[in-house]
UniProtKB/Swiss-Prot annotation:
It is found in: Cytoplasm. It holds the Pfam family tRNA_Me_trans. It is an enzyme of class 2 (transferase). Catalyzes the 2-thiolation of uridine at the wobble position (U34) of tRNA, leading to the formation of s(2)U34. It comes from Nitratidesulfovibrio vulgaris (strain DSM 19637 / Miyazaki F). This is tRNA-specific 2-thiouridylase MnmA. Keywords: ATP-binding, Cytoplasm, Disulfide bond, Nucleotide-binding, RNA-binding, Transferase, tRNA processing, tRNA-binding. InterPro entries: MnmA-like, MnmA-like_C, MnmA-like_central, MnmA-like_central_sf, Rossmann-like_a/b/a_fold. It catalyses: S-sulfanyl-L-cysteinyl-[protein] + uridine(34) in tRNA + AH2 + ATP = 2-thiouridine(34) in tRNA + L-cysteinyl-[protein] + A + AMP + diphosphate + H(+). Residues 143-145, 298-299 are annotated as: Interaction with tRNA.
């Protein structure tokens, strides 16, 4: 069975390739160019495809590169911009995994003769006695990426390989040092690959996106206490960056897009009982879900016990304990007690 290994040039994907090679797997390297060359790219920086291709040549591995920049702009970047225009907080990494890495890149791998696509994600793929193929949280809690894969179609995940699921990041780095192998592009990837410096505000300004302007900041009691810089710059639950000195810490409670009002309040106003989602991706039939399940609505959040009802148009999540309001546009990932991913959906808003 031939396996394509998605190579970004960094530590994780390189070690995934090495592990498969050491297992005797029939592999080739595959790099996707998701972004056009930057006009301000420093002259000394290597072209990623050339650097990765040279590394594969040293390892005796065939290498292919595919240009998916136009598709990435349409499927990931354009929706990212539109989400901010309408006041949501998008999750482009989850969208990219669903549409690009395990969408078009997997298609490219299959066209090149691969049966599966391996990536450097820290997530486990297991065969469950009742559910068949399942996705499970990675062994490294600090690097687990199951949350970002919860929107990937089950049939696509069945064609994936995740060699790093049982590894921790520090182990991966140590093993590369032991093997005296340096990644061609060793710097850690930034949070959003197409946003320089992870500064989404500057990115949107540079794109000359027409965004809602300033408006009033109003407390939950209806008192105007300041002005915001545009609702797109704020997220539910946010505390920092409000620019207001107040008698108590203030948080963003909600965004009134129709009236361009930012509603703020104390921590006691952040008690969301649940959330609604759309674009639901079921990895396990809800009829087979266990009684005890939990939900993550943010990447760094520990899964929170909840009840989840799946309907024709989405999921309704009801937390056991009140939570910080889930941000519209983010992902709600559903887990069982062992960390198997049961479903994912895009958050419409808190309830």
């Amino acid at each position: 069975m031939k396996i394509a290994v998605a190579l970004s040039g960094g530590t994780d994907s390189l070690f995934a390739l090495l592990l498969l090679l050491e297992q005797g797997q029939d592999v080739f390297g595959l790099h996707a160019r998701f972004l056009p060359p930057r006009a301000d790219q420093p002259s000394g920086n290597p072209d990623p495809a050339e650097a990765i291709g040279a590394m594969c040549a040293r390892l005796g591995v065939d290498f292919h590169a595919v240009d998916l920049a136009d598709a990435f702009e349409e499927a990931v970047v354009a929706p990212f911009i539109e989400e901010y225009v309408v006041g949501r907080t998008p999750n482009p990494c989850a969208r990219c995994n669903a549409t690009m890495k395990f969408g078009l890149l997997l298609d490219a791998a299959r066209a090149l003769g691969a049966a599966r696509l391996a990536t450097g994600h820290y997530v486990r793929q297991l065969r469950h006695p009742q559910w068949g193929m399942t996705l499970q949280r990675g062994a490294d809690p600090a690097k687990d990426q199951s949350y970002f894969l919860s929107l990937v179609d089950r049939a696509r995940l069945e064609q994936a390989v995740f060699p790093l699921g049982n590894w921790r990041k520090e182990q991966v780095k140590a093993e590369l040092v032991k093997r005296n192998i340096v990644p061609p592009l060793p710097s850690e990837s930034q949070e959003i690959c197409f946003v320089p410096g992870d500064d989404y505000r500057a990115f949107l300004r540079d794109r000359q996106v027409r965004l809602p302007g300033p408006g009033p900041i109003v407390t939950m009691r209806g008192r105007k206490i300041g002005s915001h810089k545009g609702l797109w710059q704020y997220t539910e639950g946010q505390r920092r960056g409000l620019g207001i000195a107040w008698e108590e810490p203030l948080y963003v409670v909600s965004k009134d897009m129709e009236n361009n009002v930012l509603l703020v309040g104390g921590r006691e106003h952040l008690a969301a009982r649940g959330c609604l989602t759309e674009d639901v991706n079921l990895l396990v039939d809800p009829a087979d879900w266990p009684a005890e399940i939990s939900v993550r609505t943010r990447y760094r959040q520990a899964p929170q016990p909840a009840r989840v009802t799946v309907g024709d148009t989405g999921m309704a999540v009801r937390f056991r304990e009140p939570q910080t309001p889930p941000a519209r546009g983010q992902v709600a990932a559903v887990y069982d007690a062992e960390g198997h991913v049961l479903a994912g959906g895009v958050i419409l808003g808190p309830v």
